[in-house]
From Swiss-Prot:
It comes from the Eukaryota. Present with 1460 molecules/cell in log phase SD medium. Residues 710-722 have a biased composition (Basic and acidic residues). This is ATP-dependent RNA helicase DBP7. It is found in: Nucleus, Nucleolus. A motif (DEGD box) lies at residues 307-310. GO terms for cellular component: nucleolus; nucleus. It holds the Pfam family Helicase_C. The keyword Nucleotide-binding applies. Keywords: ATP-binding, Helicase, Hydrolase, Nucleotide-binding, Nucleus, Ribosome biogenesis, RNA-binding, rRNA processing.
Amino acid sequence: MSDEDSMLLNFTTNEDTAGSSYKQAAKVTGGRWKDRRRMKMKLEGKTVSRKRKANTTGDEGIIPGRGENSIKKLHKESSYSSEEQEKYKGRNAHNTQGRTLPADSQFVSSLFTSNREITTAVNTNIHDENVAINPSNAPLKGDQFASLGVSSLLVSHLEQKMRIKKPTSIQKQAIPQIIGNAGKNDFFIHAQTGSGKTLSYLLPIISTILNMDTHVDRTSGAFALVIAPTRELASQIYHVCSTLVSCCHYLVPCLLIGGERKKSEKARLRKGCNFIIGTPGRVLDHLQNTKVIKEQLSQSLRYIVLDEGDKLMELGFDETISEIIKIVHDIPINSEKFPKLPHKLVHMLCSATLTDGVNRLRNVALKDYKLISNGTKKDSDIVTVAPDQLLQRITIVPPKLRLVTLAATLNNITKDFIASGQQSKTLRTIVFVSCSDSVEFHYDAFSGSDGHHKNLTGDSVRLLTKGNTMFPCFSDSRDPDVVIYKLHGSLSQQMRTSTLQHFARDNEATKGKHLIMFCTDVASRGLDLPHVGSVIELDPPFAVEDHLHRVGRTARAGEKGESLLFLLPGEEEKYMDYIQPYHPMGWELLKFDKEILMPAFKDVNVNRNDKFIRKDEKSSKNKDVGDKEYEWDTNATTWHLNIERRVVGDSAFKNLAVKGFISHVRAYATHISQEKKFFNVKFLHLGHLAKSFGLRERPKAMGLQSSKDGNSEKKPTKENSKNKMFRMARMAEKQIASEFNY
């Protein structure tokens, strides 16, 4: 072998390069594509990133309203240079759909843009201020109760204790006819709200009893049965009756309403009573299950009064009323014991409006009746109208601006009250909304914003304290003198009663203060709340009859009053033509921006609630700093953003807002069929309406059903039969092996 044949070549190879080329040449087959991809990445020496790194730049995140479970793909970290990333962001900044945003970012829409155009430019039913107004429900000047046949004892009691000297128009017509009636006719009393219908039937009944020569006490039996649709109205009638009979202590009324202990009511019935006042359900319950009530009625019952008949039918009490009347008619009446009373039952039906339900109830309860009315006759029909001295106002507000416009309205009323200097009087305002959840939201929004409040009666009455910034007119140097109330049917009966009593009371606790009550229609019927200056209908009523009852809480018994109705642009504007016959004195059409928002938010400085404010800056609030003028629209936007930020940061308040919005939309869909052309849920812009509840997106888009807030729990999965069998077997084996099994 030659040297050339035995020559050796020595090459140095890189093991990493060789291994890499081998790995790259390897091909993974079989299995799922995810498994193949993981194996390929492992062969290539790459690690699988299971968790996404936190993004400190805030350029990427989770779309608000979409939970983490909804994100199914994770983007890989960008390998582009910083210049390329900025260029990409700028090119795609206009399109955020389908991309991730910061976790705490939300779309904040402007209050004053993208609103529906208001088409009503001219008021077709102008209120003429130069026309002399005579209050339509005021007491008559030239008449006296004594001339109507009222007992002299009652007349002196009315003048001295109750400060009532003159009868109203409906009282002048009803009292003589009821007193002079010997059981011949029934009566249908029809009169507008605030005209004194309660006294028009209580006074003649009590006068007839007092004019008897026979001795009467609480054991003489019940002379009258009064049925009211709501607990509040029944309680009010009871208190009026108690005040009237306080001049003759031997006459005793009894109240039967739901929410109270039946045992206590039975005890009062056993002691005896002369007037039974209650709600239909509880009265029927006692008639069916309490023996003593039939004994009370059989001795002396002569009068059956159905107050607020339209509401009785609206709430579905028609069958209950029919059952009560049937049971009462089956009770034999002894007419020999009190010969001066009517020889048969006298039925009375009272209503402020004439509806189909009232006509049905009239056919069931009344026979040979007389119609007593002070309504306006038109085309042979009786039309109920609002009181002449009522100043009706209407404003058309876009849905996004409802909340801030309500705040501006309440601010203007409070500011005018403070400027008037009437510290010895009490101003009352009632705000009607459609549902109880909406009441809860608005109550907490206006009373619990910054912690400057104090609970007075449970959690339904709050006094705003010094430092509160809810209204722009508030000053740090004095107390706001504003008390916020809430009232709806979901509250307990004790809380409803105590809230109404506190709102209606005139004492040192309410003297010189502005009392604002957020309520549903539970407070719209029959309640005689003293000195209610303004009524605000934030949500339109479900029927025009409810509108008359709402505005009837003010301008009562000849007093002046104001009412403001909120409407949305579009189809709701035609509602004004629908209610025009009920307002013969016309109304004022207010522009929400120039006549409500601007007076409230100009020349003030509304501060943000997410920044710390120094004392020197805080003291300059509500003062002109040099020649600086604050834009009213900027202040209004800041005020509304404060509410929105509170919704974002406070989960409990957010739940109130979401529930209030959902319940409001559901309630909006329950308008009667005749008014669907004005109030149709299809016409609503739900996104704009959600903003009026402080929500930046509709609740469904905010992941209401997800566990984003950590409050909702996952539903347990259903256990199949096999796992259940094994679990039961393990439990049996454990029980056998237990030391306590002997």
